[in-house]
Curated annotation (Swiss-Prot):
Enzyme Commission no: 5.1.1.1
Protein keywords: Isomerase, Pyridoxal phosphate
UniProt-annotated catalytic positions: K40 (proton acceptor), Y268 (proton acceptor)
Tagged with keyword Cell membrane: no
Protein name: Alanine racemase 1
Length: 376
């Protein structure tokens, strides 16, 4: 679907804030550590290509995505930086990955022949990173014996084992770091076993956003920063360690403002009724845009610095807010901020996500493609 701007609703993406965040992380890293900017899920809803390009300009050295489709979009935009496919790549997609110089995650011999065949026929060397399951129980090899066995199978002229990595399950826990250290020790044990067998792998990485901020002793050769690249924290306690700026804000303009009499129901299901004459503004956004129904009669938006309640059920394409408390007249030219930078007086994503009974990772990813992204 072609995204147009014929509707007064949009997402603002601050590339200056993104640059600030990348540089904050670069300054925070251990000297030998590189920064991978994770831009999967269309850059967490921010737009993968603009985010990737600016992140690299600001100092990131590597990109990370979940699947090959996401990486191909970045390659088609002319971005040539290394890209790691963090998830599984099926055999039928391996050739395209190798053709476009994408780095594959491998944790079994399932795709090994496809990788070798692709590299041989394309006259290229396939780069791979081995995935270790140190306690997430998702994908990866669990033991040093399994890793060594795979490493032995990978000793062919068609393949370059560039990296090995794991993923932390509980690094954002502000009450205990025990499980994170347990995972780190497991990963280190596997590294030691590989070295004892004579294997040396150049890039070892384990830190996600939370671990990158909280555990500098685990930075190793590279860190993978996803959610915090966008100025969002996996845990509130991490704000005390590293200053970041929220990159995304969600805005709209009213399509109608009207006075509604007392005792008048608003929207589907009659879940809200005015107590007095109220000034109600209708916004051209709804749950199809990621403006969740869970915010109905619970959430607030900001108009002229005033927090205005969302009233009635949020519809698929429209929603209503009560602007009665705004001190100035609200017009169709006024900007309503759904969420934005807390330091600028807007409702932060953390609050919106909590009211949606989810996490801000999901909140930003839910904003639909029909909401245009404006890069400022």
């Amino acid at each position: 679907m072609k995204v147009t701007s014929y509707r007064d609703a949009w997402v603002e993406v601050s590339l200056d804030a993104l640059t600030y965040n990348v540089r904050q992380f670069k300054n925070h890293l251990q000297e030998k550590s590189r920064l991978m900017a994770v831009v999967k899920a269309d850059g967490y809803g921010h737009g993968a290509v603009p985010i990737a390009r600016r992140s690299l300009e600001a100092g990131a050295e590597y990109l990370g995505v979940a699947f090959i489709d996401e990486a191909l979009q970045i390659r088609e935009a002319g971005i040539l930086a290394p890209i790691l496919l963090l998830g599984f790549t099926p055999s039928y997609a391996v050739r395209e990955a190798v053709r476009h110089d994408l780095t594959l995650t491998v944790y079994s011999t399932e795709t090994l022949e496809a990788i070798k065949d692709a590299a041989r026929s394309l006259d290229k060397k396939a780069k791979i990173h081995i995935k270790v399951d140190s306690g997430m129980s998702r994908i990866g090899l669990r033991s040093s014996e399994e890793v060594i066995s795979l490493m032995t199978s990978l000793q062919t002229e068609e393949i370059e084992v560039e990296g090995i990595f794991t993923h932390f399950a509980d690094a954002d826990n502000d009450e205990s770091d025990a499980y994170t250290y347990k995972q780190f020790e497991t990963f280190q044990g596997i590294m030691e076993a590989l070295e004892n067998e004579g294997y040396s792998i150049p890039i070892k990485h384990c830190c996600n956003s939370a671990a990158t901020i909280a555990f500098p002793d685990m930075h190793m050769d590279m860190v993978r920063v996803g959610i915090s690249l966008y100025g969002l924290y996996p845990g509130q306690h991490l704000k005390e360690i590293l200053s970041l700026q929220q990159v995304m804000s969600f805005k709209a303009k009213p399509v109608l403002i009207k006075d509604v009499p007392p005792h008048q129901p608003i929207s589907y299901g009659l879940t809200y009724e005015t107590k007095e004459t109220s000034k109600i503004a209708t916004l051209p956004i709804g749950y199809a845009d990621g403006f969740s129904r869970l915010l109905s009669n619970v959430g607030h938006v900001t108009v002229h610095g005033t927090a205005c309640p969302i009233v009635g059920r949020i519809c698929m394409d429209q929603s209503m807010i009560d602007v009665s408390e705004v001190q100035t007249d609200v017009t169709k030219d006024d900007i309503v901020t759904i969420f934005g930078d807390e330091n600028a007086g807007y409702i932060p994503l953390d609050v919106v996500a909590e009211q949606m009974q989810t996490i801000h990772y999901e909140t930003v990813c839910l904003i639909g493609k029909r909401v245009p992204r404006h890069y400022v």
